[in-house]
């Protein structure tokens, strides 16, 4: 599969790292970003959180050279002017965060690409796929613009699926304690979205909205109207944690919930959901490729139907890994 990356920020760079790390059959032809190629090369080579890329990396004649691989740099603001038709692009990995509406993402298709995968929650009627949860519903005949949901939805959905399949869910509230991201400010400043969001990310725990819980219903429709949530942005570089407070349909014990999570992590959700019963903290999961790591020691029960569950996730690496998984699934099932 021939792909291009539009937007080479945190997720775009980590997606490329994952593709190259696993020697994927996915071939990256080009990267489109308005930042100069030499600066993008530097940011790809050196990463303050995930370390230096282990191969030779350099910029040469408007190309990113990684080992023996050569990837063209483009710098085009107008998506419809991009040379996707000439390059024979099968799929655009849309990582700018700007083209989340179907009509905007379809501009890549108008430029000659066959499909678009958005690395963010899609707006409107864009099909949303979470690996391990509903990815098998992908239809190559009609799903040309798709979304990989958000990192938080990718963490919450596997946990919710295990609960739904084994015990049923009456209702639930989710809180994600989320690492800082590039959209936040280092010192206080104005924010268009909400005033609190403009406060300095190094000095504050910042309450924020998130559509992650409601977005779970896009891949698990049975939960519509049963889940919602919020976020706290906290001053750490990477790794976030979901706190799910949930009322179940069936009476059970916390031990039985743990057993169900462990079994799922070893069978249907292997490689997606992990299970830990060790005394872990957030930094222990930097670089984790799992969507969700269920923390058996952190959860609690109030009674036989009301529980608080905890799951960790590397909101960068875990999410980027799922994008590559979804790419490869689309490739395999579009032939």
Swiss-Prot record:
It is an enzyme of class 1 (oxidoreductase). The active site is at residue 151. It catalyses: D-glyceraldehyde 3-phosphate + phosphate + NAD(+) = (2R)-3-phospho-glyceroyl phosphate + NADH + H(+). One of its GO terms (biological process) is glucose metabolic process. Keywords: Cytoplasm, Glycolysis, NAD, Nucleotide-binding, Oxidoreductase. NAD(+) binds at residues 10-11, 33, 77, 119, 315. GO terms for molecular function: glyceraldehyde-3-phosphate dehydrogenase (NAD+) (phosphorylating) activity; NAD binding; NADP binding. Its EC number is 1.2.1.12. It is found in: Cytoplasm. D-glyceraldehyde 3-phosphate binds at residues 150-152, 181, 210-211, 233. It comes from the Bacteria. GO terms for cellular component: cytoplasm. The keyword Ribosomal protein does not apply. Pfam families: Gp_dh_C, Gp_dh_N. Pathway: Carbohydrate degradation; glycolysis; pyruvate from D-glyceraldehyde 3-phosphate: step 1/5. InterPro entries: GlycerAld/Erythrose_P_DH, GlycerAld_3-P_DH_AS, GlycerAld_3-P_DH_cat, GlycerAld_3-P_DH_NAD(P)-bd, Glyceraldehyde-3-P_DH_1, NAD(P)-bd_dom_sf. The record marks 178 as: Activates thiol group during catalysis. Belongs to the glyceraldehyde-3-phosphate dehydrogenase family. Catalyzes the oxidative phosphorylation of glyceraldehyde 3-phosphate (G3P) to 1,3-bisphosphoglycerate (BPG) using the cofactor NAD. The first reaction step involves the formation of a hemiacetal intermediate between G3P and a cysteine residue, and this hemiacetal intermediate is then oxidized to a thioester, with concomitant reduction of NAD to NADH. The reduced NADH is then exchanged with the second NAD, and the thioester is attacked by a nucleophilic inorganic phosphate to produce BPG. PANTHER family: GLYCERALDEHYDE 3-PHOSPHATE DEHYDROGENASE (PTHR10836), GLYCERALDEHYDE-3-PHOSPHATE DEHYDROGENASE-RELATED (PTHR10836:SF76). Homotetramer. This is Glyceraldehyde-3-phosphate dehydrogenase. It comes from Chlamydia pneumoniae. The gene is gap.
């Amino acid at each position: 599969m021939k792909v291009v990356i539009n937007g080479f920020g945190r997720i775009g760079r980590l997606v490329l790292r994952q593709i190259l790390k696993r020697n994927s059959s996915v071939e990256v032809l080009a990267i489109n970003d308005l930042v100069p190629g030499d600066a993008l090369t530097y940011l790809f080579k050196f990463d303050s959180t995930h370390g230096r890329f282990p191969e030779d990396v350099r910029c040469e004649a408007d190309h990113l050279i990684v080992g023996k691989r050569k990837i063209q740099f483009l710098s085009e603001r107008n998506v419809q002017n991009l040379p996707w038709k000439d390059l024979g692009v099968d799929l655009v990995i849309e990582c700018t965060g700007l083209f989340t509406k179907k009509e905007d993402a379809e501009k890549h298709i108008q430029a000659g690409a066959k499909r678009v995968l958005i690395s963010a929650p899609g707006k409107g009627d864009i099909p949303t796929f979470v690996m391990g949860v509903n990815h098998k519903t992908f239809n190559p005949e009609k799903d040309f613009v798709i979304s990989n949901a958000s990192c938080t939805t990718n963490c919450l959905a596997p946990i919710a699926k295990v609960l739904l399949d084994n015990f049923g869910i009456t209702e639930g509230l989710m809180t994600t304690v989320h690492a800082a991201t590039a959209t936040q400010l280092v010192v206080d400043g104005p924010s268009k979205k909400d005033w609190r969001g403009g406060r300095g990310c190094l000095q504050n725990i910042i309450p924020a909205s998130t559509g992650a819980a409601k977005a779970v219903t896009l891949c698990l429709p049975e939960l519509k109207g049963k889940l919602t949530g919020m976020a706290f942005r906290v001053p750490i570089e990477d790794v976030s944690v979901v706190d799910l407070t949930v009322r179940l349909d069936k009476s059970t014990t916390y031990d039985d919930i743990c057993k169900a999570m462990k079994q799922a992590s070893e069978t249907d959700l292997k490689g997606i959901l992990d299970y830990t019963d060790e005394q872990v903290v957030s930094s222990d999961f930097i670089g984790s490729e799992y969507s969700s790591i269920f923390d058996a020691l952190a959860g609690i029960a109030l009674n036989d139907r009301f529980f608080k569950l905890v799951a960790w996730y590397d909101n960068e690496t875990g999410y980027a890994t799922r994008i590559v998984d979804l790419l490869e699934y689309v490739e395999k099932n579009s032939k």
